[in-house]
Amino acid sequence: MGRTRKGRAISGWLVVDKPAGMTSTAVVNKVRWALEAQKAGHAGTLDPDATGVLAVALGEATKTVPYITDALKCYRFMVRLGLSTRTDDASGEVIATSEARPTDAEIAAALAAFRGEIQQVPPQFSAVKVEGERAYDLARDGERLDLAARPLWVESLEILSRPDADHVELEMVCGKGGYVRSIARDLGEALGCYGHVAWLRRTWSGPFEAEDGISVATIDELARSEALLSLVLPLAKGLADLPELPATPEGAARLRCGNPGMVIASDVEFGEEAWASYQGQPVAVGIYKSGELHPSRVFNL
């Protein structure tokens, strides 16, 4: 007989404004504890020193995580010019310096090469796997890694401010798998002056915004209370980028069993991904074909 998972069957999203100095996994564990939830996960890792939106999926909402990780995200960050570090952020040992400082115009011109479809090499200290091991574990042991470049879509990358000659504040909107530390490193190299991330904040991720997130202090304060539970957003929030199709009663019953079910289509095209609802509740995600949704994920709500 299978072991029953302990905790409450809560499904939805809790948006956290992650503080610096805390790992994304630690935030998820705190949320799970505070809500006594059976299951939780996050939609996109933030570095420990980074702040901003961390969307925590609970229960059946974990099935919608891929739609958030695939969505566009926005980052604001400060690049420290003139210094290169082992980790490409302020926590690492300085390994190279330069007295050169680019002008605002030179920075603006260099940013053009980092927009659109680019190839990006992850930082040495990253969660990328190398022959089954995490890159950061190998890097800590002193190994210099030859990491392969990966494609990244950069929707926009703009200068927000130039506080002084040593710093430039940028804002980037990008797709899945982007490393802001790599942008800072590569920009510094392109400008001939080195660079690393001084600080980093994710301001939004898909439909979730940092300004709507709650602090870890609030989670501690409201732990195990109905007040915290009331802050959990509906599961459907994670499906905001997909069209919704109302299911017929018979269609909903079939979808819940994993079978194609009849839906009421509007302007959804054949072969398009969508999600079905019945009486206001998400039922399944799948592919629309000829009046039916063919489910790929079914929600047990």
Curated annotation (Swiss-Prot):
Keyword RNA-binding attributed? no
Q: Work out whether the entry's keyword set contains Oxidoreductase.
A: no
Q: Name one GO biological process term.
A: tRNA pseudouridine synthesis
Q: Could you state a single Gene Ontology molecular function term? A: RNA binding
Provide the transmembrane region boundaries: none
Origin: domain of life: Bacteria
Give the reactions, separated by semicolons, that this protein catalyses: uridine(55) in tRNA = pseudouridine(55) in tRNA
**Keyword set, alphabetical order:** Isomerase, tRNA processing
Q: What is this protein called?
A: tRNA pseudouridine synthase B
**Source organism:** Cereibacter sphaeroides (strain ATCC 17029 / ATH 2.4.9)
Gene field? truB
